[in-house]
């Protein structure tokens, strides 16, 4: 995760960098197809976001390594990019809590929602079922790079907080917190995928 990767850089290196190497070696030996879960942080802030944090850098570097393995060893692969996944069973506590789950938990406990400044950071929140459907489709039909899986609707973090109808407190800015990310879903949509869920409706159900 982006902000936490500064503190847990050793974990980022072990899980992201060493992890993908092990997976690629497995794919090379077995002939399996790899569907790699890249990160939309690669497209943050007009392309500058890929170096904004240890997390973003390792995920972006991994996509290049996957492509190189395709060229060097002829492995079969497709690279997907997730955009701010939300849904059931998210982590709601601790430093790895996801935004929607964290806000939901705070509202239930009548606590203040905290938003990292400036609050105008935009995100394309995408429901987990839409993500899974995209992965399956790309796994069956996709080849190569560039399969973004993300909702076309984008909202600022402050807009999301206001949907919960609670008290809001602004926090100082943090390292690696990108403002935007380019949505690259054209290749995935060409396979027949589209986002079918709406974050506003999901939040309304959560707080009702």
Regions found by a protein language model. Give the residues of each.
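N-terminal Rossmann-like NAD(P)+-binding domain of SDR-like oxidoreductases, especially those catalyzing
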Residues: 1-85
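Residue-level signal for the nucleotide or nucleotide-sugar donor/cofactor binding architecture
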Residues: 7, 15-18, 52-53, 57, ...
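Structural element of the ATP-grasp superfamily
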Residues: 23, 66, 103, 187-189
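Short beta-loop-alpha junction of Rossmann-like oxidoreductase domains
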Residues: 46, 88-91, 158, 187
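NAD(P)-dependent short-chain dehydrogenase/reductase
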Residues: 54-56, 67-123, 128-139, 162-165
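C-terminal substrate-binding subdomain of Rossmann-fold SDR/epimerase-dehydratase oxidoreductases
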Residues: 107-208
């Amino acid at each position: 995760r982006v902000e936490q990767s500064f503190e847990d850089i050793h974990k980022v290196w072990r899980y992201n960098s060493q992890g993908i190497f092990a997976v690629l070696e497995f794919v090379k030996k077995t002939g399996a197809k790899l569907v790699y879960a890249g990160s939309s942080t690669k497209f943050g802030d007009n392309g500058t976001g890929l170096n904004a944090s240890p997390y973003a850098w390792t995920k972006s570097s991994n996509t290049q390594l996957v492509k190189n393995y395709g060229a060097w060893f002829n492995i079969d692969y497709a690279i997907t990019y997730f955009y701010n996944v939300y849904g059931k069973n998210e982590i709601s506590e601790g430093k790895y809590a996801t935004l929607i789950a964290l806000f939901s938990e705070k509202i239930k406990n009548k606590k203040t929602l905290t938003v990292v400044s400036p609050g105008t950071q935009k995100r394309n929140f995408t429901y987990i079922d839409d993500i899974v459907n995209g992965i399956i489709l790309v796994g069956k039909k996709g080849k190569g790079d560039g399969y973004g899986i993300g909702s076309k609707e984008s909202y600022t973090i402050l807009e999301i907080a206001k949907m919960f109808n609670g008290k809001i407190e602004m926090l100082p800015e943090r390292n690696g917190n990108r403002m935007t990310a380019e949505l690259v879903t054209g290749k995935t949509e060409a396979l027949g995928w589209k986002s079918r869920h709406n974050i506003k409706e999901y939040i309304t159900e959560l707080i009702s």
